[in-house]
Regions:
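Acidic/aromatic-lined carbohydrate-recognition and catalytic surfaces
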Residues: 1-109, 115, 148-169, 174-175
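Active-site-proximal helices and loops of the catalytic beta/alpha 8
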Residues: 4-12, 18, 34-36, 41-42, ...
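Residue-level marker of alpha-helix boundaries and capping positions
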Residues: 23-24, 120-121, 264
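Short glycine/proline-rich turn/loop motifs
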Residues: 103-118, 136, 251-258
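Residues at structural and domain junctions
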Residues: 108, 112, 116-119, 144, ...
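Alpha-helical scaffold elements lining the catalytic groove of polysaccharide deacetylases
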Residues: 117-129
C-alpha cells in the first residue's frame, strides 16, 4: 500500500501511484523486494483497498497522481451519496460540495470515504492503479480488501481488464454469501476471482477449541448440523468451489491482537491446523506469524503437499475419524496421493497399511503418509517430532 498520511498498516489508503514511502519502507525497497521474489519464482500479491479511500485535508479531497503521462484525481462526486450514513453529505452540503447521486453498491464502512464504483472516474482511477501495480511495480496478483463493500461485478470488470495471474477477495461472511460473491465476478462465463474460505478457518478453530477432531468434517455452527460448510468441503455443491477457495487457519483480523481483541483465534495446535490445511484441496495461505515460528515444520508440510501433487482441484475422502483423530486421503485424478492424520497419530497407526503408505512426516498431533508406489525424493522427516501444545 502507498503512503497513508502517517503510520499505518495500509488499510487507510491515500496514495495509489505516486507515493510509496510507507510504514514498511520506501518505493525502491518495495521494487527490490518484488523483483527479488520474482527471480526466485515467487509472485507478490498486492493488498488492494478500493472500497474506501482516505482524504488529504478535508472530507472530500483526494491526491492528484500521474501515471503514463495522464493525471488521475478523484473528486467529491466520486463518493457514495449515503457515505457514513449521511454524515458526509451533511458536511458536503454545509461546505458547498456535491456527492454522487448513487448510493453504495455494497455494505457501508465508516471512517473513510466509500467510493462509488459506478463512477467512470473511479473506474478510470482504479484501472490505472491496478495497471501500475502489475506492470510498473511488478506485482503478480491482487488480494481485494472488503469486497462486500461494492458489487462483485466491479471486481469482474477490473480483473478482466487488468488480467492478474491470481486474485482473491476478502468476503467475510457465510459460505452462501461467499459463493454468491464468487459467482458475481463472472465475465463471459468465467469466474474472475477466488475468495478466502472463512468457514474452513472457523471449522478448524471449532475442532481445536472443543478438543474433538470430528468437527473438522462438520459445518461451522454451534451444533455442527447446519449448512455453513467450508468452500473446500464436498458437502458444499460437491466441491464445486474448492478451486476458488483460499484456505487459511489464522489471519491479521482473527488472531489475538496486542490490545486483546480477536475474532475466533486459533489458541493451540498451530502445527496440526496447518497440516490439515496443507493436506486439503483449495489454495492454502499460511499465516506469516506461523511461518516465522515454525519454518522447518511448515516447509516440510509444503514439500509433502507438492510431492503428493495435491492442488486446488484435488478431492479427499474420510479414512478414519473419532474424537481423538481425523484422517483423510487426498486424491488427485482419482489417485490416492496423501494420507493425513490430525490428532492422536499413535491411535490410528495400526489401521494404516504399510504396504500402501509410508510415513514421511510426523509432529505434535499430525502425520503425513505418501503412497509407497510414488517415486519421490521427499526426505523422511518422521524423527522431527515436536513435543508440547502448539
Amino acid at each position: 500500500s502507498g503512503y497513508c498520511g502517517g503510520t499505518s498498516m495500509g488499510y487507510a489508503d491515500l496514495y495509489w501511484i505516486n507515493n510509496y514511502n510507507s510504514s514498511f519502507g520506501n518505493e525502491q525497497e518495495l521494487r527490490t523486494l518484488i523483483s527479488t521474489f520474482k527471480e526466485k519464482g515467487i509472485g507478490t500479491i498486492a493488498d488492494v483497498v478500493i472500497n474506501h479511500r482516505k482524504n488529504v485535508s478535508n472530507w472530500v479531497d483526494f491526491p492528484r497522481e500521474t501515471y503514463k503521462g495522464e493525471t488521475y484525481e478523484m473528486v467529491s462526486t466520486d463518493i457514495c451519496s449515503d457515505d457514513d450514513d449521511g454524515e458526509t453529505k451533511k458536511w458536503a452540503d454545509k461546505n458547498g460540495y456535491s456527492l454522487s447521486t448513487n448510493k453504495d453498491s455494497g455494505e457501508g464502512w465508516g471512517g473513510m470515504r466509500d467510493l462509488d464504483h459506478n463512477s467512470e472516474n473511479v473506474q478510470k482511477c482504479v484501472k490505472a492503479y491496478l495497471d501500475f501495480l502489475l506492470n510498473d511495480l511488478g506485482y503478480t496478483g491482487f488480494r481485494y480488501d472488503m469486497v462486500k463493500g461494492y458489487k462483485a461485478s466491479f471486481t469482474a470488470q477490473y480483473n478482466s481488464e487488468a488480467k492478474p495471474q491470481f486474485s482473491v477477495g476478502e468476503c467475510w461472511d457465510s459460505s452462501n454469501t461467499i459463493k454468491s460473491w464468487i459467482e458475481g465476478t463472472k465475465t463471459d462465463d468465467a469466474l474472475q476471482s477466488a475468495a478466502f474460505d472463512f468457514q474452513f478457518k472457523y471449522v478448524v478453530r471449532n475442532a481445536v477449541d472443543k478438543s474433538d477432531w470430528t468437527w473438522l468434517s462438520k459445518p461451522n455452527d454451534d451444533k455442527g448440523t447446519g449448512n455453513n460448510w467450508p468452500l473446500v468441503n464436498t458437502n458444499l455443491d460437491q466441491g464445486k468451489y474448492r478451486r476458488y477457495a483460499v484456505t487459511f487457519v489464522e489471519n491479521h483480523d482473527t488472531e489475538v491482537r496486542p490490545d486483546g481483541s480477536s475474532n475466533g483465534p486459533l489458541k493451540k495446535d498451530t502445527l496440526a491446523a496447518n497440516a490439515f490445511m496443507l493436506a486439503m484441496p483449495g489454495t492454502p495461505c499460511v499465516f506469516m506469524k506461523h511461518w516465522q515460528k515454525y519454518p522447518t515444520q511448515i516447509k516440510a508440510m509444503v514439500a509433502a503437499r507438492k510431492a503428493a501433487g495435491v492442488n486446488n482441484e484435488s478431492s479427499y475422502a474420510n479414512f478414519r475419524s473419532n474424537k481423538d483423530y481425523y484422517a483423510i486421503v487426498s486424491k488427485t485424478n482419482n489417485e490416492n496421493r496423501l494420507l493425513a492424520v490430525i490428532g492422536n497419530v499413535a491411535a490410528i497407526e495400526q489401521s494404516v497399511n504399510t504396504q500402501q503408505w509410508v510415513k514421511v512426516l510426523e509432529g505434535y498431533h499430525y502425520a503425513y503418509y505418501l503412497p509407497t508406489t510414488m517415486e519421490t525424493a521427499y526426505a523422511d522427516l518422521s524423527t522431527g517430532i515436536h513435543q508440547g501444545e502448539q
